[in-house]
Amino acid sequence: MEGEAQKATASWESGTLAPVDRLRSVRADSPIPGLVEGTEPGAGQKSAMFIHAHSFEDLTAEAEEEALRTADSGRSEEQHEEGLKALVAEQNIDEQHSNDLSDSRTKEEDVSSEAWRSHKKHVFVLSEAGKPIYTRYGTEEALSSTMGVMMALVSFVEAEKNIIRSIHADGCKVVFLTKSPLVLVGVSRTCQSDKEMLRELQYIYYQIVSLLTLTQLNHIFQHKQNYDLRRLLTGSEYLTDNLLIRLERDPGLLLSAVTCLPLPSSARDVVSSSLQAAKSKNLVFSILLAGDRLVTLVRKKDQFLHHIDLHLVFNLVGSSSSFREGEGWTPICLPKFNTAGFFHAHISYLEPASQLCLILVSTEREDFFNMSDCKQKFMERLSKRSAYQALKEAVKCPSYSVVQVGIPELRHFLYKSKSSGLYTSPEFPMVYQSDGEQERLLSLYQELHSCLHHPTRPLRYYYRCRETENLLAQVTSGFELYLCFSPLATKASAFAAVNKLLKWIRKEEDRLFILSPLTY
């Protein structure tokens, strides 16, 4: 079994992640629940865009070990210091960014107040020396003693040759994630499982690594264990704040997938080919976004992007409006691709008031003008085609109504194609229009997700009746599906709806998914 499991994972080859060949050449004529991966609705017909992984850890374990071994190789201490200074200079973020979020941080909140304790979820990040690095609510200074106690618990258990994973008491969960040289702690009074909380802590960890690289992070603490990492992260807290909001509201982070802008395949193909033609020697990824939806992604041959890296790019773009002011140029580490170094991203909007944002990722630090030329070539080519108008029209209506599916009792659903790493879902109906109701529905999906992916007792189906809605979840080797029905729906009608929905997705897959991703 272990041998088979190892064959199913991705491997590092010359610094490039090579995905497992899971795509099947034969697609099913009609969707059925037992579809194998590669033939389900939404499966890519040519090649995958994203890395496939069974867990958050199996793709980075080797990379992180390598980063630890090579943190100091070939670089003097003076070079490290120069690199850190350059990093601080490049990532000196204007204070206006922190005002871009509608849910601004309550940094001045009294940590001894009832309001602070009443938050359903807290996140803390500290160093292994117990130095505070980040807290979602309140100030790090006010919580330094609390974080010291957390580190003492971790150290005490480690001294006994063990690892502390979680504490459950009085309806509260405290989950620990040690990613040397950092310790991340989540405290929750929600119904989230330990695994779901670990997933969120993983995202926070990768967000920090994306700002510094794991190599720099290890070097800092190897030379000074009690270093105050906030000195380097000052001004970037808004990214972590916004990521935590996304974790509560974006189904893609739950499903480990990305959603596409619904667009006729003919128009998407023109956009993709226009982006493919605007290439450059050092260009690795060309990504076109429409708000929080992917329009297309063109990659260098044999280079693959992980969904976590793409979510971090989404978060970077969505956390600030400053990129609308012109052409941005920023360093970014894609931790699932390479934890040791920076890429450099050219970020700009196609038009000042547009939701269409183009991200060109280069391996070269001094490549700004080349990337700017690539954008101009793309715009010159695209603007002459009718597909550009079709794209702008699609952005005006970035989702679709569940009514189009033709299942009266169905209120909402999430469908993920495993082989493509893409998912689709309709807009929220009126009953879930408020932010609170949307977060409640997502929390219900999280509970279903936890049941399907239980570490020791995973389920293939799960049906649940509630006063306000009925829910059905299903997982096969090809897809994951989560459905929300009216409370008047029966179990029989819910299961009958699955095949009907899959047939509808198959019929619409050209519009809802990227079936033929392009490469340079």
Report the location of each language-model feature.
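Intrinsically disordered, Ser/Thr-rich regulatory regions of eukaryotic membrane-trafficking proteins
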Residues: 1-520
